[in-house]
């Protein structure tokens, strides 16, 4: 039997609870999901740690959306966020930094890795926009990261199957490949079979309606970027169970 591991990308404490109940081994807690995930708040991390009794807690360390080229003040912010996550009991973190030329920013990563000593580290999807995946793989291994979260440099992990397979073969067990982006109950079996990857990152979210009786839908909190204030996406126990079950049931 293969030792599959399932990480759920959670956007709230509510989603963390659902992930744990659904059987996730680990969560990656994020704020700012529409931006690709940003560092969650102190309170969110603290409450997630409180409710996650059987599921490991990882926290994304990303001070903003956009690219992965960080200023000195942003790097200092990331260092402080790593320390915050550690103090609150996180088991690990996810971060990634690039140079302006799309290379892994090794000196900055070394600072973050030193600050993360004793924590499990995922080099997140900054990898998917780097210039040279093969070179980056070796650099990330040398940095001592535990895993790389990647879609195979494509819009979804399913489209990235060829590179995911190649990366796993190149890694030769020196680092874990965590397949993520668009992984769901319908495609997880194909991704596992065709890549040989054993760790999967997915959100298992559904949209739920707001409980507000009064709604002023003429106003958007996002200004010109319209995201409805009257519905939100949360991880559901059923979708977590279905995604895990569809793979483990065919072992």
Where in this protein do the model-derived segments appear?
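Hydrophobic faces of well-ordered beta-strands that scaffold small-molecule active sites
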Residues: 4-10, 27-29, 57-61, 93-95, ...
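Catalytic cores of alpha/beta
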Residues: 11-21, 69-81, 128-143, 167, ...
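Active-site-proximal loop/turn and secondary-structure-junction residues that shape catalytic pockets
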Residues: 12-14, 31-33, 61-65, 97-99, ...
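Active-site beta->alpha loop and helix N-cap motifs at the rims of alpha/beta catalytic domains
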Residues: 13, 45-51, 55-106
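Glycine-enriched alpha-helix->loop->beta-strand junction motifs that scaffold or abut catalytic
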Residues: 20-27, 52-54, 89-92, 115-119, ...
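Glycine-rich phosphate-binding active-site loops on the catalytic face of alpha/beta enzymes
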Residues: 26-38, 84, 88-100, 145-158, ...
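Alpha-helix-loop-beta-strand connector modules within alpha/beta enzyme cores
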Residues: 37-65, 104-126, 161-185, 227-250
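Hydrophobic, well-structured mid-protein blocks that either form specific transmembrane helices
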Residues: 90-146
């Amino acid at each position: 039997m293969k030792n599959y591991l399932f990480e759920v990308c959670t956007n709230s404490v509510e989603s963390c609870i659902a992930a744990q109940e659904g059987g996730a081994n680990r969560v990656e807690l994020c704020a700012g999901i529409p931006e690709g995930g940003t560092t969650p708040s102190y309170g969110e991390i603290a409450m997630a740690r409180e409710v996650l009794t059987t599921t490991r807690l990882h926290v994304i360390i990303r001070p903003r959306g956009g690219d992965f080229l960080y200023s000195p003040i942003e790097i200092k912010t990331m260092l402080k966020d790593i320390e915050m996550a550690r103090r609150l009991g996180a088991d690990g973190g996810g971060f990634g930094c690039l140079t302006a030329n799309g290379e892994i920013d090794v000196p900055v990563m070394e600072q973050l890795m030193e600050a993360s000593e004793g924590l499990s580290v995922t080099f997140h999807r900054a990898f998917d926009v780097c210039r040279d995946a093969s070179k980056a793989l070796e650099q990330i291994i040398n940095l001592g990261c535990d895993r790389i979260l990647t879609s195979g440099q494509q819009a979804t992990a399913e489209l990235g199957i060829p590179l995911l397979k190649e990366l796993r073969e190149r890694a030769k067990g020196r680092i874990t490949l965590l397949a993520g982006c668009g992984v769901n109950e319908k495609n997880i079996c194909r991704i596992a079979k065709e890549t040989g990857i054993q760790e999967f990152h997915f959100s298992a979210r559904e949209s739920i309606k707001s409980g507000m009786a009064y709604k002023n839908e003429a106003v958007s909190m996002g200004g010109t970027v319209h995201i409805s204030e009257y519905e939100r996406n949360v991880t559901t126990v059923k979708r977590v169970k279905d995604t895990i079950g569809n793979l483990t049931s065919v072992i």
